[in-house]
């Protein structure tokens, strides 16, 4: 148990992701869940039935008057993020915003400016980047194990959409898009974290069942010269959990990242690894997670994400998943949709 006072945190938005973050904040030894905010106050009974003990307030102002937090987690529909962030920053609170950051690059950059001007710690909810295997693969790439980076292939698939869908999540104006904005953005964040800013891309999207994009193919050129292809769909049968992967080629070898392991082939020894094939399994990596909310889907990443945010709030040093990095992801999302609409490459 930490000797430091807990980070007092509130959750704005009492939907699915709001409840996920609420549970984490309630049980983490360094945080205290002080309240939820949602205009639908009838949700209080549902929250209580799920074991969430914090009170529900009808507005941010009501929360601040009754139980002022140190940090706020924004888990409302994407199109509301900018307005909610502006309201939350009426007082100085640290800021966590669920992904995607906004429905447009302009709104995402406005959110970043608000947080920067307020001088608060900030982070975005790209949780898969917190998986130990994803972080270990990043460290190998950053350490130069592969030598000069050349190209990559990536994918993100899940079995979710096989017919008409209703709700804000499937309305482009409210969700910002379909599979690209709301699922593949996890992989886009990882690509940006590994390779930096993009220079140009060309994309195609298709709507098979819903009114938003259900699949997409994207060819990237990054500013550092790395090129690669992303294929994604949430209409792939037989994939109940998100299946993501990344293969990176460099002049000194190849790295293949999957959910539970890294396969590494080096032409010459580098970064503490011998030449030839080696495997790094998730179980080989340091276990620094106090709890795992859902082991079968890599739930340890949620704990690590929260711990990263708490540490950043304590130290004032922004985490790698800051809103600035999320804006890089938003630039990719917007460029993908622009290219698909134009049927032509887009400079980003």
Explain the meaning of each model-derived region.
Residues 1-51:
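N-terminal Rossmann-like dinucleotide-binding module
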Residues 4, 120, 147-150, 338-348:
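C-terminal capping/lid region of NAD(P)-dependent oxidoreductase domains
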Residues 21, 54-114, 301:
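Beta-loop-alpha module in the N-terminal Rossmann-like domain of NAD(P)-dependent dehydrogenases
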Residues 97, 122-124, 257:
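Hydrophobic residues in well-ordered beta-strands that form the structural core
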Residues 109-128, 147-152:
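Rossmann-fold dehydrogenase core element
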Residues 127, 222, 245-247, 251-324, ...:
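C-terminal glycine/acidic-rich active-site capping loop/insertion
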Residues 128-210, 219, 343:
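Predominantly a Rossmann-like dinucleotide-binding segment in NAD(P)-dependent oxidoreductases
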Residues 189-265, 303-316:
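Contiguous beta-strand/loop segments that form the cofactor/metal-binding neighborhood of enzyme cores
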């Amino acid at each position: 148990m930490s000797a430091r006072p807990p980070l007092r945190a509130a959750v704005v938005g009492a939907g699915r992701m709001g409840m996920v973050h609420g549970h984490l904040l309630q049980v983490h030894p360094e945080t205290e869940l002080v309240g939820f905010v949602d205009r639908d106050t009838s949700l209080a009974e549902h929250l209580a039935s799920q074991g969430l003990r914090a009170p529900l307030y009808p507005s941010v102002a009501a929360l601040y008057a009754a139980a002022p937090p140190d940090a706020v987690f924004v888990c409302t529909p994407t199109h509301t993020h900018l307005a909610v962030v502006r309201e939350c920053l009426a007082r100085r609170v640290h800021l966590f915003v669920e992904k995607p950051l906004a429905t447009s690059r302009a709104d995402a950059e406005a959110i970043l400016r608000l947080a920067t001007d307020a001088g608060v710690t900030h982070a975005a909810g790209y949780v898969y980047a917190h998986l130990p295997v994803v972080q270990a693969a990043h460290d190998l790439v950053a350490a130069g194990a592969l030598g000069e980076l050349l190209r990559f292939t990536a994918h993100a698939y899940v079995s979710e959409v096989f017919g008409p869908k209703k709700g804000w999540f499937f309305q482009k104006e409210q969700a910002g898009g379909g599979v690209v904005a709301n699922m593949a953005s996890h992989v886009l964040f990882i690509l940006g974290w590994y390779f930096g800013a993009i220079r140009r891309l060309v994309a195609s999207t298709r709507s098979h069942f819903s009114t938003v994009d259900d699949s997409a193919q994207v060819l990237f050129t990054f500013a550092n010269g790395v090129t690669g292809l992303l294929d994604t769909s949430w209409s792939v049968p037989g994939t109940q959990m998100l299946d993501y992967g990344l293969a990176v080629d460099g002049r000194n070898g190849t790295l293949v990242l999957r959910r539970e392991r890294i396969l590494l082939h080096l032409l010459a020894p580098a970064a503490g690894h011998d030449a030839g094939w080696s495997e790094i399994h998730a179980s080989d990596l340091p276990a620094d997670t106090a709890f795992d909310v859902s082991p079968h889907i890599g739930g340890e990443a949620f704990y690590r994400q929260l711990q990263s945010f708490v540490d950043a709030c304590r130290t004032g040093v922004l985490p790698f998943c800051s809103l600035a990095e999320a804006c890089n992801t938003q630039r990719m999302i917007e460029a993908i949709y622009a290219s698909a609409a134009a049927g032509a490459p887009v400079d980003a």
